[in-house]
Each structure stands twice: as C-alpha cells, then as structure tokens.
C-alpha cells in the first residue's frame, strides 16, 4: 500500500521531481555559479507571504538536506502592517508547508503614507533595513530574498524608463549600512511563469502585493494603479504577446555577464542606494541594440551605430 504523503511532502516532491528542471536545477546552479552560500553561513530567509518567497523558503529547506555545505537558516516574516486576513494566510501557508516562521511586527505601511509621490521606494528601503537589522540580531550573516529572472529584467527596464540609466539587480552584494551582512538572491535564474505553474500545480494560494496603498489604488479597477513595476510587467507581457521575438533572455544574459565580471573583479559589489549595479554611459550605448529590441520600437530604417 503506497504511503500517504503530507501536504508539505507533496510540495517538496513536486519541486524535486515535477519541477526539477525549471525550478530546482536553476536554483542550485545559481547558488553555485555566484557562490552565494559558504560553510558556516547563518541565513535569514525573508518571507513576504507571496509565491516567490514561500517557494524560496521551501527550496532553502530542501537545500539544507541535500547539500554537503553546512549552513543554518531562519525564516523571517516582517509584518509591515498586513490586514488580519493576509497575516493569517501567511501563517496558514507556512504551517501547510512546514516552514517554521518567526513573525516580527512593524508599522512601515503607516509610516510610508507620508510619501505621497514614491511610497513604494520608501517602503522598500525601510523593509530592507528592518530585515537586515532583525537578521543581524538573530545572529545571521546573510539575508536571502526571492527575486527571480523576471525581477532582474523588469528592474533594468524600469530604470531605463524612469531613472534614465541602465542598471542591473545583482545576485549577491554586501551591505554598507550593516557591516558583515550580505544579501543573496538564490532564485536569480528562475522564471516567474515556472513559479506560477508550481503554485497552481499544488493548488496553493499565497498573498499578492499586500500593500494598503496598492489595495486602495486597485479599487479603481485598472489593476495597475501607480505601481511603476506593474506597468513595466504589463508592458513586457504585451510585447511578448504581440512580438514573440522580444528577447528578454538576451537582456538577462548581458546583465549576467556584467554582474559576473563585477563580482569577480571586486569580489562582491557593495549595497548601493538602489541596491543595484549601475552601468557606465559607454556600456549603455554598447547594449542599446538590445534595448531597441526589447521595447519593440519600430523605425523606418535600421540605426547605424558605426
């Protein structure tokens, strides 16, 4: 008689078997390629309650069991002011997936209401600082975030459109404000559509963006509101639907190449104000062909860059 698996065991098996190629392999490859984990590391896995961070937490658990590198983990949930329903869903999902979370309260959502123009930026910076601080108090030397392939591309395009610069999200970096602390992104090479497929395969229901400001804006019915990241995500989705030749992988490969060279040259890039690697003007022009392809600008004749 076959053994009945617990929900957590079924979820783990789906990662290691059904989604081994799109999830587990790029997860392990990214950690090895960027040397994210070293023996003796004490890593705070930061959980927001969304699909990305919950998958990250489960894969970090699995990695501890299947790797020869000894390291410790803490599963840190920072509650910035979630409503009761979202908080309870995080607790329920963590119990279902057998992830031993530790929840810490803050009032970040209330504090960021004062920033009328850029509340998302202020919120992100405050959340990052809180996570670094709490992780350090817990004896951790690293925090792990659930950013993935799509986040890397979207951040680059968002910087081009709204920051007038080509910049990239790094797979790992040092913190300037918290000496001895590092940030790693183990899901750097994983595609969001594969995360969604895994979630649906297991019939899991995670919270989306639980920001109070976002909830209020979405009542207007446009589904996007003033979120610049949501606008870029929709833009790239539309481009892929209307022009299958839109090449996000090509842009990611260029980011990967620049990031790898920077990490090798300086061992690891420092945490900047935007927590990203900034390219020089010369590099921007060198990659501008990819930019044209990505945003699908129709021109009467090809540009001659000499």
Feature map (PLM): residue ranges:
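An accessory alpha-helical subdomain
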Residues: 231-259
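Catalytic subdomain that performs nucleotidyl-dependent activation
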Residues: 72, 151-235
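Charged/polar low-complexity intrinsically disordered segments
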Residues: 264-268, 283, 287, 301-304
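Disulfide-bonded cysteines in secreted/extracellular proteins and peptides
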Residues: 120-123, 140, 211, 263, ...
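Intrinsic-disorder-associated, low-complexity terminal segments enriched in Asp/Asn/His/Tyr and depleted
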Residues: 266, 271, 275-278, 296, ...
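Cationic, amphipathic, low-complexity alpha-helical segments enriched
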Residues: 255-258, 265, 281, 291
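ATP-dependent adenylation/nucleotidyltransferase module used to activate substrates
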Residues: 2-158, 162, 166, 170, ...
């Amino acid at each position: 008689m076959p053994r009945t698996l617990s929900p957590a065991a079924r979820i783990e098996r789906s990662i290691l078997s059904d989604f081994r190629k799109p999830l587990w392999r790029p997860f392990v490859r990214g950690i090895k390629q960027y040397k994210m984990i070293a023996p003796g590391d004490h890593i705070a896995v930061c959980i927001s309650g969304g699909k990305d961070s919950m998958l990250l937490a489960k894969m970090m658990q699995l990695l501890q069991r299947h790797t020869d590198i000894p390291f410790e983990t803490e599963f840190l949930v920072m509650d910035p002011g979630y409503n009761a329903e979202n908080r309870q869903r995080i607790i329920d999902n963590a119990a279902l997936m057998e992830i031993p979370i530790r929840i810490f309260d803050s009032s970040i959502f209330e504090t960021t209401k004062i920033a009328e123009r850029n509340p998302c930026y202020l919120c992100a910076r405050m959340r990052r600082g809180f996570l670094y601080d709490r992780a350090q108090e817990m004896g951790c030397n690293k925090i792990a975030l659930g950013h993935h392939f799509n986040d890397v591309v979207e951040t680059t395009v968002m910087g081009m459109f709204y920051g007038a610069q080509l910049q990239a999200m790094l797979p790992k970096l040092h913190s300037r404000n918290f000496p001895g602390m590092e940030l790693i992104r183990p899901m750097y090479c994983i595609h969001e559509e594969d995360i969604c497929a895994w979630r649906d395969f297991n019939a899991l229901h995670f919270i989306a963006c639980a920001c109070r400001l976002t909830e209020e804006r979405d009542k207007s019915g446009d589904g996007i509101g003033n979120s610049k990241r949501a606008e870029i995500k929709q833009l790239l989705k539309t481009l892929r639907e209307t022009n299958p030749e839109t090449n996000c992988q090509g842009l990611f490969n260029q980011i990967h190449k620049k990031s790898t060279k920077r990490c090798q040259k300086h061992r690891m890039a420092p945490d900047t104000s935007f927590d990203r690697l900034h390219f020089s003007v010369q590099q921007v022009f060198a990659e501008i062909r990819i930019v044209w392809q990505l945003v699908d600008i129709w021109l009467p004749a090809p540009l001659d860059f000499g």
